[in-house]
């Protein structure tokens, strides 16, 4: 690649983004692709500290605007410190969540003004958008059931939210898919992991112009 390529992974809780990414990494490395994987919120020291505040199960009184601004602050630091240097070095950067999460969770989920969220995203990223977004879609109930069955997963504040919020979040993602279908590709995350990985690989390789 002559320049970096930015991919974001999005989806409701329990969609299995992390498992797919773990399976993809060795495939990409075999192709000789330099890959940086990272996550939001987090990715760098300041971002990880903000992540702890956001996801702490005891912070149930957190205001929706406070939550949004914490995500935005983490996003900016993460971008400047880690993502942009990797892109400038010509790497493939795969982010577990990015700008669309704010629209889906704080916009549709929390009911905050989406134009304001778009402005904050623009401000924090200087207009940077992913070259490709992979949206892993799954029915809310199935995703939450996966989380409940995963004893290794630490419970966070968002896991304690009611079903209604998670349904609004999924609707937000589907709305984004309708609006930005040229950038966002929907992947059926309810299928067996092997099939999801194969579909993801195909979409990613097409987007990057790599031979399969």
Curated annotation (Swiss-Prot):
Phosphorylation of dTMP to form dTDP in both de novo and salvage pathways of dTTP synthesis. It catalyses: dTMP + ATP = dTDP + ADP. The keyword Transmembrane does not apply. ATP binds at residues 11-18. Pfam families: Thymidylate_kin. The lineage of its organism: Bacteria, Bacillati, Bacillota, Bacilli, Lactobacillales. It comes from the Bacteria. GO terms for molecular function: ATP binding; dTMP kinase activity. Gene3D superfamilies: P-loop containing nucleotide triphosphate hydrolases. Keywords: ATP-binding, Kinase, Nucleotide biosynthesis, Nucleotide-binding, Transferase. GO terms for biological process: dTDP biosynthetic process; dTTP biosynthetic process; dUDP biosynthetic process. PROSITE patterns: THYMIDYLATE_KINASE. Its EC number is 2.7.4.9. The gene is tmk. Belongs to the thymidylate kinase family. GO terms for cellular component: cytosol. This is Thymidylate kinase.
């Amino acid at each position: 690649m002559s320049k970096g390529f930015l991919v974001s992974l999005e989806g409701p809780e329990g969609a299995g983004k992390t498992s797919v990414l773990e399976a993809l990494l060795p495939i990409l490395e075999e192709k000789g692709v330099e890959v940086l994987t990272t996550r939001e919120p987090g990715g760098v020291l300041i971002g990880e500290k903000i992540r702890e505040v956001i996801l702490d199960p005891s912070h149930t009184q957190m205001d929706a605007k406070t939550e949004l601004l914490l995500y935005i602050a983490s996003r900016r630091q993460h971008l400047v410190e880690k993502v942009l240097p990797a892109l400038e070095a010509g790497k493939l950067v795969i982010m577990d969540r990015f700008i669309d999460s704010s629209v889906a969770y704080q916009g549709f989920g929390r009911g905050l003004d989406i134009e304001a969220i778009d402005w904050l995203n623009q401000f924090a990223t200087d207009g940077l958008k992913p070259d490709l977004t992979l949206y892993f879609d799954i029915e809310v109930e199935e995703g939450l059931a996966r989380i409940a069955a995963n004893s290794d997963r630490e419970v966070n504040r968002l896991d304690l939210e009611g079903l209604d919020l998670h349904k609004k979040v999924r609707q937000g993602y589907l709305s984004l898919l309708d609006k930005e279908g040229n950038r966002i590709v929907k992947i059926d995350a309810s299928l067996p992991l092997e099939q999801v990985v194969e579909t993801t690989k195909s979409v990613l390789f097409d987007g990057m112009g790599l031979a399969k």
